[in-house]
């Protein structure tokens, strides 16, 4: 006879305001939706949605990732989002638009791309 497996009920909490962190690199786009304290509620990546290789870095892949993360965070009762965009990737604007299309009211969009004050030496230029 099989043992009864006890599954713990997932504790759902309601959060009215959150922060969407969009990390858009040249190779991938990562969308993380957190509460105000920074605790992750939902996340998605372009690569995790089935896009591989150079298709990961397209605006459409970033849009799909933002939609998936946005719909997953709707379970927490989120209504308003502040958007923090980091990185120079091609999926920056399309991810923000996708979050608005899911149904969130976007309060602010902030660019938090780290800019060095002459820090590390950048990689050498490509010769194709």
Curated annotation (Swiss-Prot):
UniProt xrefs under PROSITE patterns: RIBOSOMAL_S11
Keyword Cell wall biogenesis/degradation: no
This protein's UniProt keywords: Ribonucleoprotein, Ribosomal protein, RNA-binding, rRNA-binding
Keyword Disulfide bond on entry: no
Cystine connections: none
Pfam families linked: Ribosomal_S11 (PF00411)
InterPro entries given in the database record: Ribosomal_uS11, Ribosomal_uS11_bac-type, Ribosomal_uS11_CS, Ribosomal_uS11_sf
GO annotations of cellular component type: ribonucleoprotein complex; ribosome
Swiss-Prot/TrEMBL GO biological process terms: translation
A GO MF label: structural constituent of ribosome
Family recorded in the similarity comment: Belongs to the universal ribosomal protein uS11 family.
Known role: Located on the platform of the 30S subunit, it bridges several disparate RNA helices of the 16S rRNA. Forms part of the Shine-Dalgarno cleft in the 70S ribosome.
Assembly behavior: Part of the 30S ribosomal subunit. Interacts with proteins S7 and S18. Binds to IF-3.
Protein name as catalogued: Small ribosomal subunit protein uS11
Organism the protein comes from: Acinetobacter baumannii (strain AB0057)
Phylogenetic placement of the source organism: Bacteria, Pseudomonadati, Pseudomonadota, Gammaproteobacteria, Moraxellales
């Amino acid at each position: 006879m099989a043992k009864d497996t006890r599954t713990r009920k997932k504790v759902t909490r309601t959060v009215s305001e959150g922060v969407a962190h969009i990390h858009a690199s040249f190779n991938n786009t990562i969308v993380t939706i957190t509460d105000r304290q920074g605790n992750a509620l939902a996340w998605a990546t372009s690569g995790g949605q089935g896009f591989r290789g150079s298709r990961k870095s397209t605006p459409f892949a970033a849009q799909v990732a933002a939609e998936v993360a946005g719909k997953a965070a709707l379970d927490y009762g989120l209504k308003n989002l502040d958007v923090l965009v980091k990185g120079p990737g091609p999926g920056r604007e399309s991810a923000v638009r996708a979050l608005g299309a899911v149904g969130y009211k976007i309060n602010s969009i902030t660019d938090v791309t780290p800019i060095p004050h002459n820090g590390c030496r950048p990689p050498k230029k490509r010769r194709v």
